[in-house]
Every structure is written in structure tokens, then in C-alpha cells.
């Protein structure tokens, strides 16, 4: 009989960091509120939530790497908003941000103890799309990235219980 491992949304054990880009702050602050609210609703104490702010999404990967290296957090949620303009700037910023956070997430998952890094950076064509995804119409993507983080933290804990690695 195969063994199945799934994450869940039970109250996770450990501390969480939320890394938020200040650029497009009217959007990213809504994402951050959604993330904090989701953690609290899932049993994480205020004292176990730290919020770090950086200038923009391009700076997020470096910040996330520093935060994961502290080994204080079981989960790190990254939040930002890149909105397409009339120049190729969007492509460079969005692409480098995604690659950088992805690389940190890969390293963090392989570390002992494993850490979860989730991606909650909006990449939209218009301001209206970003506003909708920050909670007006299409749900709050900050909350969604946080749910993914909680689920993965709990999955890694279950895996560690069977593979001998420290959660």
C-alpha cells in the first residue's frame, strides 16, 4: 500500500516572515494584510510573525535569502506587485524576481531543517488587475501565498517525521 503525504491547514508550529516590496504599496499593503490575517486565522500568534519591507520586487530575492539564512522561520511569504508599463522594465524585474525567489525556495527546501518560501508577487498588465488580485474581486493573492506556505510547512514537518531529518 503506498504512503501518501499531504500538507494541511492545521496550526503550524514555528515562526513566519512576510517579505513585502514597498513599490506599488497601495497594492502590496493589501497583500500583506491578507497574509497576516491568514496566519492569525490559522493559529499563528502575532509574536511569531515578522514583516520585512524592501524598496521593490527586484530587491525581494536578496531579502528573502537573508531572512531564510537566519534560520528563525519555518516559512517565508514573498509579496510584491509588478505592473506592465510601456517599457521592457516589467519583463526584467518580474523575471529576475521570480528566478531569484525560486532559487532561494529551492535552497531553503533542501536545507536542514527545511524551510518553505512561497511566491505571492503579482505580475499584471494593468493596475486594475493588480487591485482585483489584492482583494477587491479575485481574492487576495497574499492570503493564497500564505495558505500555500502553511500547507508546505506542515508537509515538510510530516516528511521530516518519517525521513529522520529535523523539521
From Swiss-Prot:
Gene Ontology MF, one: 6,7-dimethyl-8-ribityllumazine synthase activity
Binding site for 5-amino-6-(D-ribitylamino)uracil: 23, 57-59, 81-83, 119
Catalytic residue positions: 89
InterPro entries to which the protein is assigned, alphabetical: LS (IPR034964), LS/RS (IPR002180), LS/RS_sf (IPR036467)
E.C. number: 2.5.1.78
Record carries keyword Lipid metabolism: no
Binding site for (2S)-2-hydroxy-3-oxobutyl phosphate: 86-87, 133
GO biological process: riboflavin biosynthetic process
PANTHER family linked to this entry: 6,7-DIMETHYL-8-RIBITYLLUMAZINE SYNTHASE, 6,7-DIMETHYL-8-RIBITYLLUMAZINE SYNTHASE DMRL SYNTHASE LUMAZINE SYNTHASE
Role summary: Catalyzes the formation of 6,7-dimethyl-8-ribityllumazine by condensation of 5-amino-6-(D-ribitylamino)uracil with 3,4-dihydroxy-2-butanone 4-phosphate. This is the penultimate step in the biosynthesis of riboflavin.
Protein name: 6,7-dimethyl-8-ribityllumazine synthase
Annotated organism of origin: Myxococcus xanthus (strain DK1622)
Gene coding for it: ribH
